[in-house]
């Protein structure tokens, strides 16, 4: 066993020349401080020796949201790692978890004696106190992982075998079934990454078939196996003919000798072979091989080959028992058994290859079938067309009503506006009924129709009544509901911006672009594994990435995207009840994550130190500006003002790569004040995680808890829980929130999905508080930007002279990427990064600390506006300042 461990270590060093080269050029201590990805089974490697069982206590990091480490007993057998509180619980099958190390990405960090197992669904963090125990566990895990991967490669249809008897939970079997079905080919994919193969990460239908056809070496191997099998069968036929000659040559008296003397031993041998057969193949494997001519009859021979069960090799009693004849006949028996073994293993290998290829073809056919248009899709398209037509008609009616209202004198308009505000307040107070019955709280996916039937409040400027009939309170058709929501949002915007500001906002909105100058490039030729494999557990904000992985937006502009639904704060500023104001503030905090649902495939540009960005939106009524106030650590600060609210925050992100997923942990606090009520709200941000970084369809999820407090009024607070996705449940991206009063009693319930809509209440009487805007046409070709994101980097010629030269829109690499010039964008990106490194070196050599121009640090170490940006913009003061050269 020790020799096998040495050979395994040598093979792992040989299969990774790039890693060994880099480690040779670095010091041993620095290599121990970094994470090392453990290599898996590669190429034609065959690891069939069963490793011994390993067990003992290890420290395991507690699952989120719990913190710290707890002691658990781990049991490793044949590549399956089980853990429980004690060894007794393991024996009783009272497991806390079960990990297939063959399907996991394993990384180790020797300096801290940590072992990470990334199963894509969960990341298991293990720690060992003793260095000897750490080395022992790492060695055993390597061997078990290689053994398990070899087993999966040989028997891909038996991945679920080791989980069939597990009693973790009732739903565990379903979890492992889904894991195995999705990961059946993960070993081969991992081998491709480790050998440096240029694998495409695109998930489009045009690349699935070529990737499948590239693995034609499996079919070639299958053809060779069948050819060898044919040769073995011919050789077996010749041996059987020779044995038949011996049978006819010798006389009958020898038969009795064989029957009386040497027949007991083969019976025992037959029983032992049966035990071997059941152990190797299983009780369900009963495949037979019909051998063609020249077999003349049902000659039976003792053989342990299960695939030759139809050949009757047991009639040895017809042969002579002479010493010379017996030895010759025994040699023929051994040769025949040996060849039969070869035939069996060759056919089994060919069968496994054919099964894997059949599974690939079946998956492709299912994907193609699911992508074809169905009657349901056609019906939804028709419903959408009718909804758009109805929406156009309702908007036309609204314009006529608004035109009539403008003909009135100004006092009447003011009076109408007051009536609208009062009416809106009464209706919204009625809509947000305290629906706190847990029995009526339904699952989003199970009762989606009820949520679309939720009550929607629609107010017309010409309406003077508060009563709404029951027939008008509920909308049963999906398209009608969407139309009414859009119309209600349009009406709210118009009511908030009556007068000249409305006209200028409409003109500005009509001038804004609806698509980017060029579509996004393909990043399928970039090997993310080569970039990220040496950065396991590191902060990726310090790792240089190719420009193709970026989107033509900056982190400072991403902060502005959080104000896409600022009308929620405008609504909150009009509601006298602090409890209901908290509902809209919570909806605004949740809406900041909506655009990220479609944007898991790219990352924003990192701002350089001193870079700024401004966004003046007359149509939404706010003025926004931001600045990169620190580079290490990277901190971005922003500030926005409106007549109804003030918004500011400073955020820094820590990105960590865990093998198959990447965690984004934000650090900072968001603040919103409503001057009309004197409210000051603050809340934290939740953790984000991007899955399937290296292969498959990337997707993002947010999990954690947001706590919203009013620092100037303790009458209420809110908790919003972003629920972590579970693989045995279809309810992903859900949120649940509760507004509590001063005594801790729940007053309002919030639920929904953070990328779709938020509801308040319970059951069919729930009121829709917020719904995401529809995505623009062809958004997949333009980085999956929302309409608001498409407008962020647009350069307005009229305001170009008002911007400081440090504004993001002047940044050349980002502009070249937006225009589709990748080569020039990469050149400019490297030049800007080098320029920033030189600036930082000069500042450090002269012991000069960078001072942000438009933000200052407050007493609580947060960054707030110093009030100079908007004043300088009014007086064209940016041209009088000395600005650093950023690009």
Curated annotation (Swiss-Prot):
Known outcome of mutating residue 71 to A: Abolishes plasma membrane targeting and nuclear localization
Protein role: Phosphoinositide-binding protein which associates with both cell and endoplasmic reticulum (ER) membranes. Can bind to the ER membrane protein VAPA and recruit VAPA to plasma membrane sites, thus linking these intracellular compartments. The ORP3-VAPA complex stimulates RRAS signaling which in turn attenuates integrin beta-1 (ITGB1) activation at the cell surface. With VAPA, may regulate ER morphology. Has a role in regulation of the actin cytoskeleton, cell polarity and cell adhesion. Binds to phosphoinositides with preference for PI(3,4)P2 and PI(3,4,5)P3.
Domains as described in the record: The FFAT 2 motif is required for interaction with VAPA and regulation of the endoplasmic reticulum targeting of ORP3. The FFAT 1 motif may contribute to VAPA binding.
Protein name: Oxysterol-binding protein-related protein 3
Membrane topology (UniProt): Peripheral membrane protein
Entry-linked PANTHER family: OXYSTEROL-BINDING PROTEIN-RELATED (PTHR10972), OXYSTEROL-BINDING PROTEIN-RELATED PROTEIN 3 (PTHR10972:SF15)
GO biological process: bile acid biosynthetic process
Entry keywords, A to Z: Cell membrane, Cell projection, Cytoplasm, Endoplasmic reticulum, Lipid transport, Lipid-binding, Membrane, Nucleus, Phosphoprotein, Transport
């Amino acid at each position: 066993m020790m020799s096998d461990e040495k050979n395994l270590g040598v093979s792992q060093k040989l299969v990774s020349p790039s890693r060994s080269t880099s480690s040779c050029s670095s010091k041993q201590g620095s290599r121990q401080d970094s994470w090392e990805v453990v290599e898996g089974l590669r190429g034609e490697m065959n690891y069939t020796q069963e490793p011994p069982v390993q067990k003992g206590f290890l420290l395991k990091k507690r699952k989120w949201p719990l913190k710290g480490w707890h002691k658990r007993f781990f049991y490793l057998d044949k590549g399956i790692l089980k853990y429980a509180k004690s060894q007794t619980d393991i024996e009783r099958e009272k497991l806390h978890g079960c990990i297939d190390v063959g399907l996991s990405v394993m990384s180790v960090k020797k300096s801290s004696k940590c072992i990470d197992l990334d199963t894509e669904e969960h990341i298991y963090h293990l720690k060992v106190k003793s260095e000897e125990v750490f080395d022992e566990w790492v060695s055993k895990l390597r061997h078990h992982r290689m053994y398990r991967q070899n087993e999966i490669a040989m028997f891909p249809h038996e991945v679920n075998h080791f989980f069939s008897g597990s009693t973790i939970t009732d739903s565990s079997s379903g979890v492992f079934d889904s894991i195995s079905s999705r990961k059946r080919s993960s070993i081969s994919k991992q081998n491709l990454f480790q050998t440096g193969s240029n694998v495409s990460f695109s998930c489009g239908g045009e690349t699935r078939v070529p990737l499948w056809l590239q693995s034609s070496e499996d079919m070639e191997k299958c053809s060779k196996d069948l050819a060898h099998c044919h040769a073995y069968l011919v050789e077996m036929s010749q041996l059987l003919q020779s044995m038949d000659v011996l049978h006819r040559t010798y006389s009958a008296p020898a038969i009795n000798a064989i029957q009386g003397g040497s027949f007991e031993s083969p019976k025992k041998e037959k029983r032992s072979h049966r035990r071997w057969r059941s152990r190797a193949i299983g009780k369900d494997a009963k495949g037979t091989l019909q051998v063609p001519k020249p077999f003349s009859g049902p000659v039976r021979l003792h053989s342990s080959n299960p695939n030759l069960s139809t050949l009757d090799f047991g009639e040895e009693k017809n042969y002579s028992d002479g010493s010379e004849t017996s030895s010759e006949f025994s040699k023929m028996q051994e040769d025949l058994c040996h060849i039969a073994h070869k035939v069996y293993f060759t056919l089994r290998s060919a069968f496994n290859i054919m099964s894997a290829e059949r599974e690939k073809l079946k998956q492709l056919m299912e994907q193609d079938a699911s992508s074809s248009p169905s009657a349901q899709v056609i019906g939804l398209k028709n419903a959408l067309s009718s909804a758009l037509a109805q929406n156009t008609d309702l908007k036309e009616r609204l314009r006529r009503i608004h035109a009539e209202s403008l003909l009135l004198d100004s006092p009447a308009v003011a009076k109408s506006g007051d009536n609208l505000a009062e009416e809106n307040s009464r209706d919204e107070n009625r809509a947000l009924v305290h629906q706190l019955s847990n029995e009526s709280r339904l699952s989003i996916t199970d009762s989606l129709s009820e949520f679309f039937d939720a009550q929607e409040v629609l107010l017309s400027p010409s309406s003077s009544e508060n009563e709404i009939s029951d027939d008008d309170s509920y909308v049963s058709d999906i398209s009608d509901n969407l139309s009414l929501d859009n119309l209600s949002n349009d009406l709210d915007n118009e009511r908030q911006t009556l007068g000249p500001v409305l006209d200028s906002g409409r003109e500005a909105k009509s001038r804004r672009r609806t698509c980017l100058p060029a579509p996004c490039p393909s990043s399928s030729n970039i090997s993310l594994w080569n970039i990220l494999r040496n950065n396991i557990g590191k902060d990726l904000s310090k790792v240089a990435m190719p420009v193709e992985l970026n989107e033509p937006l900056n982190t400072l502009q991403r902060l502005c995207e959080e104000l896409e639904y600022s009308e929620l704060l405008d609504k909150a500023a009009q509601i006298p009840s602090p409890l209901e104001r908290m509902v809209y503030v919570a909806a605004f905090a949740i809406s900041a994550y909506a655009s990220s649902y479609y944007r898991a495939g790219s990352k924003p540009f990192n701002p350089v130190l001193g870079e700024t960005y401004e966004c003046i939106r007359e149509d939404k009524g706010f003025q926004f500006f931001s600045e990169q106030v620190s580079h290490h650590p990277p901190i971005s600060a922003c500030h926005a003002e409106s007549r109804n609210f003030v918004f500011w925050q400073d955020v820094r992100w820590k990105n960590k790569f865990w093998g198959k997923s990447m965690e984004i942990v934000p650090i900072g606090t968001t603040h919103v004040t409503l001057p009309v009520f004197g409210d000051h709200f603050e809340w934290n941000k939740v953790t984000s995680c991007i899955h399937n970084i290296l292969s498959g369809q990337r997707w993002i999820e947010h999990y954690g808890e947001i706590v919203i407090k009013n620092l100037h009024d303790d009458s209420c607070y809110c908790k919003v829980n972003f629920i972590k996705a579970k693989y045995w449940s279809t309810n992903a991206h859900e949120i649940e929130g509760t507004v509590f009063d001063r005594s801790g009693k729940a007053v309002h319930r919030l639920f929904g999905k953070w990328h779709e809509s938020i509801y308040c209440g319970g059951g069919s009487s729930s009121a829709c508080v917020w719904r995401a805007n529809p995505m623009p046409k062809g958004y997949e070709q333009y980085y999956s930007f929302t309409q608001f994101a498409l407008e962020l980097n647009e350069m307005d010629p009229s305001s170009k002279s008002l911007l400081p030269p440090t504004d993001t829109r002047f940044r050349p690499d980002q502009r070249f990427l937006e225009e589709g010039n990748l080569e020039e964008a990469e050149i400019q990106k490297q030049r800007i990064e080098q320029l920033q490194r030189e600036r930082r070196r000069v500042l450090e050599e002269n012991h000069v600390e960078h001072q942000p121009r438009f933000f200052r640090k407050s007493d609580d170490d947060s960054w707030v506006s110093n009030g100079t940006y908007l004043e300088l913009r009014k007086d064209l003061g940016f041209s009088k300042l000395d600005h650093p050269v950023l690009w």
